[in-house]
């Protein structure tokens, strides 16, 4: 699902497994400056508080260094050397089951939880991690946390949206839900405690609505939605002149270069045929209105049309292009209202 705001476009997962269904599998551990950010360092020693949980998540999600080396990784290594940052190039740590070399695509019994988890299939490097792993190599939550929880008796209700959470007289809460795919009867639940874990765009809008509702959760903080952080992504597409090289082979994000203490860029790919994001290769055209941005796009295309010729001719953008994903950890935030 994509949500569009004035300053950012957000891609997020909706389904059993949430964002794990569409994320790029990477599991970096933040650097010290993240834990020492001025906005929250006074609240706790976050590094020591969170370290055990990073370790648990790494184990549960089977995160390991990417063992593959494809053309995109070689290009990133060359860029790192050109920038004088060769020592700051590394393979990503990813939640993917690779299996034994030579047995890619082969199904094996659960390799993670002493046989209590589902069988898995070794990664075939098809590049389709973010559009839904076709083989069962990506360690999405439905293959670990949720799978094991169901085995212990937890009931997972798919196609269900929480519409309200209200305090219950005498203590606890009432959770109101509706089916998200059919006009069925609404179902209410009661609980002593409620954990909100719907991601930013599944949680904050619901809480804002409940704060505004006198019968909801009106005592929530007035600062709700004030400090929403992003990873400050910039997406840069590069298209080859021909289809001599298959840039789609590999995993979604396979290697990374730390350009300085606060920023890095990664090589990103989609699987063959995943061309929905082809418009991202159009020129960046800022403006105060949609009409102004469209006009600026047309102007740039007229002036520099040759640069975009390869994009127009590409039979399959996913296999004929690669994406450079730039991020930074410096503090920056949005307000959601």
Report each predicted region and the residues it spans:
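Glycine-rich loop(s) and the adjacent beta-strand/alpha-helix scaffold that form part
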Residues: 1, 135-138, 143, 151, ...
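Charged, glycine/proline-rich intrinsically disordered loops and linkers
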Residues: 1, 97-122, 283-308
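Redox-cofactor-proximal catalytic regions of oxidoreductases
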Residues: 1-68
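A short alpha-helix-loop-beta-strand transition element characteristic
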Residues: 2-8, 13, 63-67, 85-97, ...
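FAD cofactor-binding and catalytic pocket of flavoenzymes
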Residues: 4-10, 19, 23, 43, ...
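Short, solvent-exposed loop/turn and secondary-structure capping segments
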Residues: 25-26, 34-35, 101-102, 205-210
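Conserved redox-cofactor binding core of oxidoreductases
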Residues: 45-152, 157-159
